[in-house]
């Protein structure tokens, strides 16, 4: 039981490290300007992204861009927005004026949302068009990988570009379960190359070390829990044996 838990943790650790590096590029990054993202920000995105081993396989099918629906809600009428700020005395003094102008205010409430709603819809359309223009390094229709995609942040052309290409393509085309578990060796070669160039891949190295520390802590906890479970089972079996003997 204990060994199976440690094997599962080790496999999950390898896949999670692979997915942390590759999933941001596979999902695509929206580009709102002609110039691509800076190298530092692109490299940092690999360090920030993290997914669980179970969700890695499903994430492969989320490569194409999706646009989110935006609900357009009219703002509150001007008079209603002022109501909470009115003092009690002011409300009494202006009661008559409010009564005389009530029809006009009701009309404003009906007209104002009509004027503002098209603006909100226009914004939603613009954002939807921007999301449609998102780029992804992998095209599931053609099965090709665009190594020049800005979402890769130049990783395919850096000092460890060849190692990155091997690991990334292995992860993309992997049919193993969980996805990418058969790319551990290529991923390790890429990580070793990163450590040979700490001036370029400082963020990746620091993030990997932090992830290793976290996984080691989790494995230690799993081992401790496994020992506790084994001890508990031994106690229960011993108690059951004594009860059977006395019976």
UniProtKB/Swiss-Prot annotation:
Transit peptide, start-end: 1-28
Keywords on record: Disulfide bond, Membrane, Mitochondrion, Mitochondrion inner membrane, Oxidoreductase, Protein transport, Redox-active center, Signal-anchor, Transit peptide, Translocation, Transmembrane, Transmembrane helix, Transport
Bilayer-crossing regions: 46-63
Basic and acidic residues composition-biased segments: 81-96
Swiss-Prot/TrEMBL cofactor(s): Cu(2+); Zn(2+)
Region spans: Disordered: 81-114, 217-247
Mitochondrial intermembrane compartment spans: 64-247
Top-rank taxon: Eukaryota
Domain notes: The CHCH domain contains a conserved twin Cys-X(9)-Cys motif which is required for import and stability of MIA40 in mitochondria.
General function of this protein: Required for the import and folding of small cysteine-containing proteins (small Tim) in the mitochondrial intermembrane space (IMS). Forms a redox cycle with ERV1 that involves a disulfide relay system. Precursor proteins to be imported into the IMS are translocated in their reduced form into the mitochondria. The oxidized form of MIA40 forms a transient intermolecular disulfide bridge with the reduced precursor protein, resulting in oxidation of the precursor protein that now contains an intramolecular disulfide bond and is able to undergo folding in the IMS.
Full protein name: Mitochondrial intermembrane space import and assembly protein 40
Organism listed in the record: Mycosarcoma maydis (Corn smut fungus)
């Amino acid at each position: 039981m204990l060994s199976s838990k440690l094997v599962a943790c080790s496999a999950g650790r390898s896949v999670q490290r692979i997915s942390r590096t590759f999933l941001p590029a596979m999902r695509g990054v929206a580009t709102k300007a002609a110039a691509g993202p800076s190298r530092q920000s692109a490299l940092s995105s690999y360090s920030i992204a993290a997914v669980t081993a179970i969700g890695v396989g499903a994430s492969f099918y989320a490569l194409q861009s999706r646009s989110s629906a935006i609900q357009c809600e009219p703002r509150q009428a001007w008079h209603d927005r002022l109501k909470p700020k009115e003092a009690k005395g002011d409300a009494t003094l202006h009661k008559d004026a409010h009564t005389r102008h009530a029809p006009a205010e009701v009309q404003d409430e009906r007209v104002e949302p009509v004027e503002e709603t098209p603006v909100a819809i226009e914004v939603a359309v613009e954002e939807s068009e921007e999301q449609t223009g998102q780029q992804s390094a992998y095209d599931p229709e053609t099965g090709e990988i665009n190594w020049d995609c800005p979402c890769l942040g130049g990783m395919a052309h850096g000092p460890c570009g060849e190692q990155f290409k091997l690991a990334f393509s292995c992860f993309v085309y992997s049919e193993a379960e969980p996805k990418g578990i058969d790319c551990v060796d290529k991923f390790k070669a890429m990580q070793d190359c990163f450590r040979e160039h700490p001036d370029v891949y400082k963020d990746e190295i620091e993030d990997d070390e932090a992830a290793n520390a976290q996984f080691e802590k989790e494995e230690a906890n799993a081992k401790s829990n496994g020992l506790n479970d084994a001890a508990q089972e031994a106690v229960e079996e011993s108690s059951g044996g004594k009860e059977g003997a006395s019976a």
